[in-house]
């Protein structure tokens, strides 16, 4: 497994609350699948133009420290903001972000990373 290898070979804090997984586009969809299947491994989840989470998707909300979902304004942003609001209403630390004037492109994802980074690993 990759996570044990990283923890063994790099200076990490080998705890779930000190790990995040994020992906863009298809990598976001894979991030969604992995974080839902293995909530004990990652505390923070990020989907950048990679779909959404709903409160019903997450079996144990206490496992999740933060969720970030984003897309470009040309990608159908209503679903992103609705999902973020539903997660917040269910008690999750969640943030939705829409990159203005962009689509499914690297400018969207660079802006998304800038918005997501400050919410990671907060106490």
Question: Across the structure, where does each feature detected by a protein language model lie?
Answer:
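Non-catalytic cap/lid and distal C-terminal segments of serine-dependent acyl enzymes
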Residues: 1-123
């Amino acid at each position: 497994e990759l996570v044990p290898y990283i923890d063994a070979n790099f200076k990490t804090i080998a705890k779930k609350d000190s790990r995040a997984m994020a992906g863009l586009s298809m990598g976001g969809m894979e991030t969604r699948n992995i974080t839902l299947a293995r909530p004990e491994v990652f505390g923070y989840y990020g989907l950048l133009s990679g779909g959404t989470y709903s409160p019903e998707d997450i079996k144990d909300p206490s496992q999740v420290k933060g969720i970030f979902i984003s897309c470009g304004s040309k990608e159908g942003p209503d679903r992103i903001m609705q999902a973020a609001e539903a997660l917040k209403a269910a008690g999750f630390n969640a943030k939705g972000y829409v990159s203005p004037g962009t689509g499914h492109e690297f400018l969207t994802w660079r802006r998304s990373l800038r918005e997501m980074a400050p919410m990671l690993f907060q106490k």
